[in-house]
C-alpha cells in the first residue's frame, strides 16, 4: 500500500533531519527549474499568480541548486497537515513506515519519498505555464507519477487534494485501486468537508497509521478528533469518516 498526500505552500529550511535520497524525478524537476529561471518578472507573476512583491520574494528561491537539497521532503513542508503528522516526534519504526508507504505529490518533483532531499519552491499543479512547451503540469508529468506509484502496489490510499490526485486518476487501469478518504462534519443538518479540519485529520491519520504500523484492514479504527467510520457512506474505493459539529 502507498499513501499519497498533497504538498504545502508553507515550507522551511531548518530541521534536524538530513536527506537520504534524491527525488526519483530529479531530471524533470531540473527541467522545470530551468524553465522558471528563463522567465522574467511578468512571467513569474503569471506562473505564481502573485503580485510583484510576493513574486520578488519567491524569486529568491530560484537561487537554490536542486542537487544540493536542504531538507527531506517530509520535514520541508510545514503546512497544517504536516504539523498534525508531526513526523519530527515519531520513533524510528514510524519513520521507517512512512519511508516505505508515504509519497508526497508535487508540481515540481512529481512524487517524493519522505527522505528525498528538496529545496523550497513555489509551483502548484494548476499553475499556468506561459511560453513553455507543455500546456500544463498535468501534460508535463503525463503518466510518470502514476507509473512510479503503481509499479509495486495496486492500492493507493488517497489523502491528496483533487488537484494533486489528478496526477493519478486519468491513468488508472483495471485492478488499480485509488482509495479516497473523506472527512465530513455535520452543520445545519448537512454533511460537508471543512477544509481546515480535513487537513488536520489527514495529517493525524497518516501519523496514526505510522505509529501502529497499520494497513488498510485497520483503517476503520481511526477515531481521532471525534471522527468515526461511516460504513453507509463508504464503498470499495471510498472511506468516509464523520463527526457531529
From Swiss-Prot:
Stated name of the protein: UPF0246 protein LBUL_1917
One Pfam family of this chain: H2O2_YaaD
GO cellular component, one term: cytosol
InterPro entries, alphabetized: YaaA (IPR005583)
High-level lineage: Bacteria, Bacillati, Bacillota, Bacilli, Lactobacillales
Family: Belongs to the UPF0246 family.
Residue ranges that the Swiss-Prot or TrEMBL entry lists as coiled coil: none
Species of provenance: Lactobacillus delbrueckii subsp. bulgaricus (strain ATCC BAA-365 / Lb-18)
Superkingdom classification of source: Bacteria
GO biological process, one term: response to hydroperoxide
